């Protein structure tokens, strides 16, 4: 299957999977998915974009990896999704982020996800729980960026240059 067809399938799956899900800011959940997938600072390849579109499907919906594979999603994308899926009942957030740091594509998609989740302008009111979550997300972002700087310096430099750092 071509990369473009896989992207199209991923978008159809994500739209169906997140149908009728509304974020706290009132946006349909699919808007978050699209912002993550279109974050060109981090998400640079079609494989990463496909994973970004599907990044919350296995974790937050009834659809599993087997279903995605049956729909034509490649093993490369499924591997990234394996890293990105947080088993909240059995794995701490810290261990989940540590797992993500074992895969470059997962790190880049997660950075795009965290960037969107940290956009405080999307919330009507910021609670104490939100503030705590933002601290956790900032720490995760810092850890991932640190790993990028150490293990993938060229990619880190590219991101830093794009941000004017």
Describe the residue ranges of each PLM region.
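Active-site helical microenvironments for divalent-metal-assisted chemistry
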Residues: 1-165
